[in-house]
Structure formats: structure tokens, C-alpha cells
Amino acid sequence: VTTGCQRYPYDPEKATRPYPSQLAQGSLADIQVIPNINGGTLKLVNATAVSYSNFDLWMNRRYVRHVDALPAGQTVELPIDTFWDERGEGPFPGGWLRYYDPTPVILVQIQSGPDTPLVGLIAKPPDTDKR
């Protein structure tokens, strides 16, 4: 559900829980996160020998989505418009027909359990915008 006066993409039915600020980031994984502005996606490049499964992916300490699997040595692309916050607001995804600049991707973290430390990922600059 989107209306003309909304500042952000908004769907109250997609509201999630708040960012787990009580959890520390315990480690940093060699997984690059590259925004694709024209495609409105996040590319996750797992350069490690570790597979991750059944986790929540946090973006900018605000938006979250569930990810089924990120296999070792593989790349996964996720639509940015599948991330939501606790109010049911989403980031601006980009794309050719966008009205606003895409939400910058600053911090990306894996949460594998409710009480486990977060795993930080490497946020890279976006793919070149050739719009």
C-alpha cells in the first residue's frame, strides 16, 4: 500500500520487530553487500567457506528481512523492497522509475538467533548509476 503523501514505502502489515540494539556485533564476515541502484537489489557475495542459513538480515540498524540461505562461495541477490522496519516502512529501492534517491546501504548485519551476537558484513559502494 503506497499513497502519494507517504515519505517512505509503507505497508503496516509488513511491520517487523525493532533492531536488536542490545546485541553486540561479535564478528565481521568477508561477505560483500553491493547495492544495485538500477535493479533495486542488494547483492550478497559470500567469499567465505561458511554457509549461513535461516537468518535475519538487518540493513542500517532499521530494516530487516529473513533469508533462507547464503551458501559458502555463492552470490545471492535480494530485492531491497523486501526489507521492512517496525513501523511497516521500507527503504527506497532505486530503479529506473524512482522518484527519490535510493536509501544508502551503510551497515548490514546477520542475526542468526534471538540472543546470538550479530555478524557484520562489508557494505560496498553501489554499482554505478547509469540513469
Placement of each model-derived feature along the sequence:
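Generic hydrophobic, helix-prone segments enriched in Leu/Val/Ile
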Residues: 2, 33-35, 103-108
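Terminal connector regions
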Residues: 13-16, 84-131
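A short, structured loop/turn motif at beta-sheet edges
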Residues: 47-50, 71-72, 112-115
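Short, surface-exposed binding/anchoring microloops in extracellular/periplasmic proteins
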Residues: 23-68
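Extracytoplasmic
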Residues: 39, 52, 73-75, 103
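Intrinsically disordered, low-complexity Pro/Gly/Ser/Thr-rich segments with frequent PxxP/GP/PP motifs
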Residues: 61-96
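Beta-strand secondary-structure signal
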Residues: 41-43, 56, 77-79, 107-109
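Bacterial Sec signal peptide processing site at the extreme N-terminus
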Residues: 2-22
